[in-house]
Amino acid sequence: MANINMADTVPSCDTYLLFNGETLLPIGVRAFIYTAVLAYCFIGLSAITGRFFKSMESIMRHSREVVTVDPHTNATIVKHEKVWNYTIADVALLAFGTSFPQISLATIDAIRNLGQLTAGGLGPGTLVGSAAFDLFPIHAVCVVMPRAGSKKKISDLGVWLVELFWSFWAYIWLYIILEVWTPRVITLWEALLTVLQYGLLLLHAYAQDKRWPYVSIPLARGERPEDWVPAEDASVDYDDNYDGIGDILPGQNEDIVDIFSAHSYSNEGYHHVSEEDVEESSTGLTLKNKWEDTHWFSIWWQQFVDAATLESSVSRKMDSTCLRVIGISWNLIIAPWKMLFAFVPPYEIAHGWIAFICSLIFISGIAYGVTKITDQISCVTGVSPYVIAFTALAAGTSWPDLVASKIAAERQITADSAITNITCSNSVNIYVGIGVPWLVDTMYNYFVYQKPLYIDNAAGLSFSLLVFFATSFGCITVLVLRRVILGAELGGPRMWAWATSVYFMILWVVFVVLSSLKISGVI
């Protein structure tokens, strides 16, 4: 109670929302309002992340034309090659992209903390908590997603083992620099080494994918889709229009991408082109570009129309009035977010890069708002920001990961998209999500104060790392046993799938409870 009373005297608790008399409200009411606003921010974060994923998919599917001449026939041969390597796309763009809400939040927290010798607690707490949420609840959801009796396993076990090794090493490394080398202090070179290890992860994963001798694990690769976006499970009945603009041309999302991308992925391979076709193609290409521009603007305009529509064509066909009312109410709640994110250009333009960058800007803006609201919740309730970070913030920022992995586990023919992304994201959380903010703070302190960066709550963070390491070992052990005994990481007999899911959730509860008790000084 003493902490709650003290919260009223802290200047940062005076006001934040845009109405008068906020400070006159009871503490409980203010905490409820801030929590509701925080939840609304998470809804917006989930919405923009959906567009973010689609833009990444467009980027990673981009192919380029390589024109060669057949030495025997002198015919022009056009070859379409993927720009992105399958594994590098997973580690570089997908893992980084799915972790960007957490990375953005941690970086903003570090920038706000410039000028102080002590690091903020929101960033590291959120990233460690997010790693736990990714590993336990997301695995718990994915393992029960395949249909009863069906099994889905990782196709390239070697790459997964490499990524798993770097994921475990990331948390061992973090514990070493926090408790062994320079206890409770982060130096400039430690922060720099943390960031550089992300490059080593990329190199090692690529070496494993290419089966380089001496540095790769000699494991055979299973059947893997040719595209970065894996083939979809034909046994699953679903709506292709789950993305934000699915109602533009129902059931034709793939056709939209093929038409409006400068390089169609459906025509990969080789084909001969006569000289006459090459000469005559310039006029046709000009007309095609004009036609594409018109349709791009048409699609962009349709995004605003969809954002302003409270009842979709699907909900109109529902027989239940109650469900229709619920759907309209929900669309009314998220309408401001939908209208705001309609300004993000369609992901078909420039292979998705413009939508990718715009989505990053929106995610960063929401992350900044989340940090401010979290400060207010901590201030008015007296709850440690670190506790809020690895519980509410971690779950909220990882929610898009859960949705994406759930869809992948349900729709894809392999478990790579669902499981491998989790281990990659956890590595990125440390090497980039914690490394970059610490690098920013340590560089500032080194050049301005000639001082290192002090970690105020190093003991609590180190304890959380130990608990996470122990529980994650239990999680990975069960996944390996499922691979050996059942033949796949996901699916299988429903009883064992649900038993595994419950076990993973218990591990997450153990992590949250023990970490909270340590931060609160109970243990």
Swiss-Prot record:
Protein's membrane topology: Multi-pass membrane protein
Main subcellular location: membrane
Tagged with keyword Membrane: yes
Places the protein is found: Vacuole membrane
One GO CC term on file: membrane
Keyword Ion transport attributed: yes
Keyword terms: Ion transport, Membrane, Transmembrane, Transmembrane helix, Transport, Vacuole
Function summary: Vacuolar transporter that exchanges protons with Mg(2+), Zn(2+) and Fe(2+) ions. May control the partitioning of Mg(2+) and Zn(2+) between plant organs.
Name under which the protein is recorded: Magnesium/proton exchanger 1
Organism: Oryza sativa subsp. japonica (Rice)
Gene that encodes it: MHX1
